[in-house]
Amino acid sequence: IISSALKNAEDILKKSQISSWRLDAEVLLAEALLKDRSEIIIRDDLKISNKKAFTFNRYIDRRKKFEPVAYILNNKEFFSLDFFVNKNSLIPRTETELMVEKAVKIYKNKNPNVLDIGTGSGCIIISVLRHLPKSRGIGLDISNDAIKVAKFNSERLLKVYNKRIKFMNLSIEKLSNNR
């Protein structure tokens, strides 16, 4: 039953000193059950299959070891888009959305070329290009694994606009030496 699974998970996370124990337990259970968080709170008498309980327990085991929820679920919302994230990219920060919002506002009626250094998941450049449809951009990262994450997000989120963006496995030092 949802209520007992949730209570047990909350106790585990609280004991592990996870500050957002309740929210994390609810989010992880909702994902394991493929339901909205509000539904698991309202319909807490629903039964959980063994398979979904196993998935949920794996999520809780990872979270109690302080693995971020975004890495457990391989997902982080940024600027109203759902980005794939993993250990190869930093988790997009809420404060960074303010920077993207400001850039979109400043360049709304212009077509800037965008350079994203340390692109990671590609959240900044992809979000900017989604809102500036005539702009083009390049995302750089020294990690080839991060570039793979950014390309994956670009293909998913930019779709037909993908020809406007290029990702390169390159450090800023090499870029400045190639002048």
Label every model-predicted segment.
Residues 44, 54-132, 137-152, 167-169:
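SAM-dependent Rossmann-like transferase core, predominantly class I methyltransferases
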Residues 18, 132-134, 156-162:
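Short helix-capping segments at alpha-helix termini
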Residues 22, 50-53, 90-94, 179:
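Short, solvent-exposed loop/helix junctions and linker helices
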Residues 151-179:
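S-adenosyl-L-methionine
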Residues 13, 128, 154-157:
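Hydrophobic alpha-helical packing residues
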Residues 1-73:
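N-terminal auxiliary segments of SAM/dcSAM-dependent transferases
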Residues 34, 50-51, 80-82, 176-179:
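Short, solvent-exposed polar/charged micro-motifs at secondary-structure junctions
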